[in-house]
Amino acid sequence: MSNIAKVLSRRQDRGEGVGTNEKAIPFNKQDYQTLKQECLVKKTLFCDPTFPAESDSLGYNELGRYSFKTRGVQWKRPKELCSNPEFIVDGAKRTDICQGALGDCWLLAAIASLTLDNAILERVVPPGQSFIEDYAGIFHFQLWQFGEWVDVVIDDRLPTRDGKLLFVHSAEGSEFWSALLEKAYAKLNGSYEALTGGSTTEGFEDFTGGIAENYELSKAPPYLFKLMQKALTLGSLLGCSIDITSSYESEAVTSLKLVKGHAYSVTSAEEVHSYGHLVQLVRIRNPWGQVEWTGPWSDNSKEWNSIQPEEKAKLVYSGEDGEFWMAYSDFIQQFSKLEICNLTPDTLSSEDASHWNYNQFEGNWRVGSTAGGCRNNPATFCSNPQYVIKLEEEDDDPLDGEDGCTILVGLMQKDGRKDKRFGRDLNTIGFAIYKFMGRNNINLGPDVLLRQRSIAGSNTFINLREVSERFKLPPGEYVIIPSTFESHRKGSFVLRVFTEKEAAASPMDTEISADVKKQYISESDVDPHFKHLFNQTAGNDSEVSVFELQQILDSVTSKQTDVKTDGFSMETCRHIISLLDKDGSSKLGLVEFHILWKKIQKYLEVFKKHDTDNSGTMSSHEMRDAVKEAGFQLNNEVLEVIISRYANQQYAIDFDCFVGCLIRLEMLFKIFKTFDKKNTGKIELDILQVTHKCECGLRFLYLLNLAFSFTNVFFVCVLQWLCLALS
């Protein structure tokens, strides 16, 4: 399918709710119910061909085919490991998750937090799955991936060694939901090894679709404990960890039994009265299911004797289960980092869910068009995607006591874990926020962005999956500009914005339009010298054919030493004749050729003006302003298509491609306006009109059919028209 058709099809699906948790997209196009029914009818157990029980599913390096770590690994179904396997025993609990021989404690800490809210858990682990009723060796889980929910189908063959699960397992030996969830997550990311190393927030986000924020506990704001309580009340997921200074410290145990470089989940934050003083306590869980804090307020410590029995009864504080309490004052001293995942309104079932207003946008950094880099790249910075948000109401009850509008911004780049196997590194990403002075939602240009300082932004540019920050801004309109640190770095991203109050947000872009002056001339207006030259060139029929036109244009441009061209293509020459041929002869007469000549002169003038480095070609970023001067207002989406269609491997456009692009644009706008008689910005085409009146009609019909559901009539806006026809 054409990339543009894919985008338009996906956009239509989104409008119908596809990609939400209720309408999750089947991952790898595998439909759970269909596959399960097929297995039940055939009386076979499901074997997943897209994530086979083979070494490639384990990993590619340390868990690769020839690694000693994978020797003796056998894939077995739960019924081969115990006589009476169960999916979930007495409800999913955080004590069900114990780490195996995989460095994915970050993921297990997130799974543990997931069990604190059954409604959230069931969004990820659909109920009704078992090893008894309608068992077919197939299970499914729903996971959030870069802005949309996907339904991941797996078989229940799990990696084992010596009859025991190799990776995550339950303390209850016959329970398998956590091991199967880990397998689904491994499939989503390409392998088990792809899960090695990460932050708890990544798991939080992929289980909820929420947005995460990080706090350095050495710089904890004074209101952080209250913020933790509020976050837990709102169903947010919290994790914490202790930084390491070298790889030797990874998972080293301190004298007080805390594990360095290890992901913990925070499960509660409470206040109790101890000897007449109010003490703030935090409950933390180690996903190992053992190794607990031994300092003040640990299990059976003397501090528990100082509180009233009724307060003590509310807090579970004993048992070697990996969970323990500690004073908040010790928490911020012993731990280095706190991660909070704030949930989207649709995730929460309580009335408090409306606390957050949520906006989400998907975008791309395309080399040559929208990969402008950070502000250190003044020539290209303004070509980055831009988004405007309007903050109108201040917070009701600010935790920090300051008036203003709370805004959480998260910028996430896609597919980092999948790309690990190919040795690809994450981009270094960040964002800047500018005060918007109100210009009708049109992209801010260098006249604004290079003269104005950003008022906020990410603290740093960093090569992580996501960078997020919380801000307090006065009411007003702002522009958020996500970018890579370096220019010309390809990538896809999701930008998410949470606000405490309702806030309107939308992409900034240029309204698509064309202002090409029509030329009305008669034969008497043509200069006699030009007539003489035309008659010499045109021959006996006094008309220029497509072949003659190609020779003329190549001959003229070859004499221009300051522009580069590799010759006008036959396709471009046909487009020129299609645009200017008034009498249907498929040739150009004197007047038609004269109009073309004026266009070529204008295009040459524009081309030279915007070839700022005098290279004889135009860079893709120079193309943006050149097209505008030629009379076409285009947005980023159309410009991306143009660059991919007309630029060479170095993202440069020579003169013949420049002319071909402008001629094609003028022709497409002309066709669109012919159909759009009421000037609505939308046209209605039946199949006959598409195939007979549109250039490359059958191919265009094919793209339309991919992008939209097949009917006898297509409704197409100018953006869809240009993107599909140019691609």
Label every model-predicted segment:
Residues 1, 706-709:
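Bacterial/eukaryotic Sec-type N-terminal signal peptides
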Residues 1-575, 582-594, 598-605, 609, ...:
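Structured alpha-helical subdomains that flank or immediately precede key functional sites
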Residues 612:
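Short, conserved catalytic or interaction motifs in soluble domains
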Residues 615, 622:
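A contiguous pocket-lining binding segment that forms or flanks enzyme active sites
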Residues 702, 710-711:
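Low-complexity, disordered terminal segments
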Residues 707, 713-716:
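Acidic, Ala/Val/Gly-enriched low-complexity intrinsically disordered segments
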